[in-house]
Amino acid sequence: MTKQHAFTREDLLRCSRGELFGPGNAQLPAPNMLMVDRIVHISEVGGKYGKGELVAELDINPDLWFFACHFEGDPVMPGCLGLDAMWQLVGFYLGWQGNPGRGRALGSGEVKFFGQVLPTAKKVTYNIHIKRTINRSLILGIADGTVSVDGREIYSAESLRVGLFTSTDSF
Protein backbone atom coordinates (compact mmCIF):
# COMPACT_ATOMS: atom_id res chain seq x y z
CA MET A 1 0.00 0.00 0.00
CA THR A 2 1.35 3.42 -0.95
CA LYS A 3 1.60 5.94 1.88
CA GLN A 4 -0.04 9.32 1.57
CA HIS A 5 2.55 12.14 1.45
CA ALA A 6 0.31 15.19 1.97
CA PHE A 7 -2.70 15.76 4.23
CA THR A 8 -5.55 18.27 4.03
CA ARG A 9 -7.27 20.05 6.91
CA GLU A 10 -10.05 17.44 6.77
CA ASP A 11 -7.46 14.63 7.00
CA LEU A 12 -5.97 16.31 10.08
CA LEU A 13 -9.42 16.70 11.65
CA ARG A 14 -10.00 12.97 11.05
CA CYS A 15 -6.70 12.36 12.85
CA SER A 16 -7.89 14.50 15.78
CA ARG A 17 -10.96 12.24 16.05
CA GLY A 18 -8.82 9.07 16.02
CA GLU A 19 -10.00 8.06 12.54
CA LEU A 20 -6.73 8.28 10.59
CA PHE A 21 -4.38 5.84 12.36
CA GLY A 22 -7.05 3.81 14.18
CA PRO A 23 -8.47 3.79 17.72
CA GLY A 24 -5.90 4.11 20.49
CA ASN A 25 -3.19 5.31 18.14
CA ALA A 26 -1.62 8.70 17.46
CA GLN A 27 -4.07 11.60 17.32
CA LEU A 28 -3.68 15.29 16.74
CA PRO A 29 -5.47 17.63 19.13
CA ALA A 30 -8.82 19.03 18.07
CA PRO A 31 -9.27 22.70 17.27
CA ASN A 32 -8.48 25.11 18.93
CA MET A 33 -5.25 23.33 19.90
CA LEU A 34 -4.68 21.89 16.42
CA MET A 35 -2.01 24.27 15.15
CA VAL A 36 -1.72 22.90 11.60
CA ASP A 37 -4.02 23.42 8.59
CA ARG A 38 -2.26 21.03 6.22
CA ILE A 39 0.81 18.86 5.81
CA VAL A 40 2.22 19.66 2.38
CA HIS A 41 4.98 17.04 2.51
CA ILE A 42 5.86 14.05 4.68
CA SER A 43 8.55 11.51 3.85
CA GLU A 44 10.63 8.80 5.55
CA VAL A 45 13.71 10.03 3.67
CA GLY A 46 15.18 13.48 3.26
CA GLY A 47 15.47 16.29 5.72
CA LYS A 48 18.65 17.52 7.35
CA TYR A 49 19.55 14.02 8.60
CA GLY A 50 18.23 11.93 5.70
CA LYS A 51 15.83 10.11 8.06
CA GLY A 52 12.55 11.85 7.27
CA GLU A 53 10.92 15.25 7.10
CA LEU A 54 7.60 17.06 7.32
CA VAL A 55 6.53 20.45 6.01
CA ALA A 56 3.24 21.78 7.34
CA GLU A 57 1.37 25.08 7.28
CA LEU A 58 -1.02 27.15 9.37
CA ASP A 59 -3.00 29.98 7.78
CA ILE A 60 -3.01 33.11 9.94
CA ASN A 61 -5.92 35.50 10.22
CA PRO A 62 -6.66 38.16 12.86
CA ASP A 63 -9.68 36.19 14.15
CA LEU A 64 -7.64 33.27 15.51
CA TRP A 65 -8.58 32.66 19.16
CA PHE A 66 -5.20 33.41 20.75
CA PHE A 67 -4.88 36.95 19.32
CA ALA A 68 -7.83 38.12 21.48
CA CYS A 69 -6.18 37.07 24.75
CA HIS A 70 -2.41 37.10 24.14
CA PHE A 71 -2.00 40.02 24.67
CA GLU A 72 -4.89 42.46 24.89
CA GLY A 73 -3.84 45.46 22.82
CA ASP A 74 -0.62 43.68 21.73
CA PRO A 75 -1.75 40.52 19.88
CA VAL A 76 0.88 37.86 19.20
CA MET A 77 0.69 34.09 18.75
CA PRO A 78 2.09 32.43 21.89
CA GLY A 79 5.47 30.89 21.13
CA CYS A 80 4.47 27.77 23.07
CA LEU A 81 1.80 27.07 20.42
CA GLY A 82 4.46 26.94 17.72
CA LEU A 83 6.52 24.62 19.90
CA ASP A 84 3.46 22.43 20.51
CA ALA A 85 2.78 22.31 16.77
CA MET A 86 6.25 20.87 16.22
CA TRP A 87 5.57 18.18 18.86
CA GLN A 88 2.20 17.51 17.19
CA LEU A 89 3.97 16.91 13.89
CA VAL A 90 6.61 14.56 15.34
CA GLY A 91 3.78 12.51 16.88
CA PHE A 92 1.91 12.54 13.57
CA TYR A 93 5.05 11.25 11.83
CA LEU A 94 5.28 8.30 14.25
CA GLY A 95 1.62 7.43 13.64
CA TRP A 96 2.05 7.83 9.88
CA GLN A 97 4.88 5.28 10.04
CA GLY A 98 2.34 2.78 11.39
CA ASN A 99 3.51 2.76 15.00
CA PRO A 100 0.91 1.99 17.71
CA GLY A 101 0.14 4.08 20.77
CA ARG A 102 -0.96 7.51 21.92
CA GLY A 103 1.48 10.39 21.55
CA ARG A 104 2.95 12.39 24.40
CA ALA A 105 5.51 15.19 24.18
CA LEU A 106 8.56 14.21 26.23
CA GLY A 107 10.69 17.33 26.00
CA SER A 108 13.22 19.04 23.82
CA GLY A 109 16.71 20.37 23.76
CA GLU A 110 17.35 24.04 23.14
CA VAL A 111 14.41 26.19 22.00
CA LYS A 112 14.94 29.68 20.58
CA PHE A 113 12.41 32.40 19.80
CA PHE A 114 13.72 35.23 17.62
CA GLY A 115 10.58 36.53 15.96
CA GLN A 116 6.81 36.59 16.36
CA VAL A 117 3.55 35.80 14.58
CA LEU A 118 1.30 38.86 14.39
CA PRO A 119 -2.32 39.02 13.16
CA THR A 120 -1.08 40.69 9.96
CA ALA A 121 0.88 37.57 8.96
CA LYS A 122 -0.43 35.25 6.26
CA LYS A 123 1.17 31.83 6.81
CA VAL A 124 3.23 29.89 9.33
CA THR A 125 5.39 27.06 7.97
CA TYR A 126 6.73 24.25 10.14
CA ASN A 127 9.78 22.26 9.02
CA ILE A 128 10.54 19.06 10.92
CA HIS A 129 13.76 17.08 10.37
CA ILE A 130 13.66 13.59 11.86
CA LYS A 131 16.92 12.72 13.61
CA ARG A 132 16.02 9.30 14.93
CA THR A 133 13.14 6.95 15.58
CA ILE A 134 13.38 4.21 18.19
CA ASN A 135 10.97 1.28 18.05
CA ARG A 136 11.49 -0.82 21.15
CA SER A 137 9.34 -1.04 24.29
CA LEU A 138 8.88 2.70 23.82
CA ILE A 139 8.38 4.22 20.40
CA LEU A 140 10.26 7.50 20.34
CA GLY A 141 10.74 10.16 17.69
CA ILE A 142 13.50 12.74 17.94
CA ALA A 143 13.58 15.69 15.55
CA ASP A 144 14.77 19.23 15.03
CA GLY A 145 12.25 21.80 13.88
CA THR A 146 11.79 25.38 12.77
CA VAL A 147 8.83 27.73 12.55
CA SER A 148 8.75 30.41 9.86
CA VAL A 149 6.24 33.20 9.28
CA ASP A 150 5.77 34.47 5.73
CA GLY A 151 9.11 32.91 4.75
CA ARG A 152 11.18 34.20 7.71
CA GLU A 153 12.41 31.74 10.34
CA ILE A 154 11.35 32.82 13.84
CA TYR A 155 11.66 29.78 16.17
CA SER A 156 13.89 26.75 16.32
CA ALA A 157 13.91 23.67 18.53
CA GLU A 158 16.48 20.92 18.81
CA SER A 159 15.84 17.31 19.80
CA LEU A 160 12.06 17.51 20.05
CA ARG A 161 11.03 14.22 21.68
CA VAL A 162 7.66 12.49 21.34
CA GLY A 163 6.80 9.00 22.55
CA LEU A 164 3.92 6.70 21.67
CA PHE A 165 2.42 4.78 24.59
CA THR A 166 0.03 1.82 24.41
CA SER A 167 -0.78 2.56 28.07
CA THR A 168 -0.38 5.84 29.93
CA ASP A 169 -1.36 4.37 33.33
CA SER A 170 2.14 4.81 34.77
CA PHE A 171 2.89 8.04 32.92
Curated annotation (Swiss-Prot):
Question: Alphabetically, which GO biological process terms does the record hold?
Answer: unsaturated fatty acid biosynthetic process
A GO term from the CC aspect: cytoplasm
Tell me the GO molecular function terms. Answer: (3R)-hydroxyacyl-[acyl-carrier-protein] dehydratase activity; trans-2-decenoyl-acyl-carrier-protein isomerase activity
- Domain of life (superkingdom): Bacteria
Function, as annotated:
Necessary for the introduction of cis unsaturation into fatty acids. Catalyzes the dehydration of (3R)-3-hydroxydecanoyl-ACP to E-(2)-decenoyl-ACP and then its isomerization to Z-(3)-decenoyl-ACP. Can catalyze the dehydratase reaction for beta-hydroxyacyl-ACPs with saturated chain lengths up to 16:0, being most active on intermediate chain length.
The protein's assembly and partners:
Homodimer.
Give the protein's recorded name. 3-hydroxydecanoyl-[acyl-carrier-protein] dehydratase
Give the species. Answer: Stutzerimonas stutzeri (strain A1501)
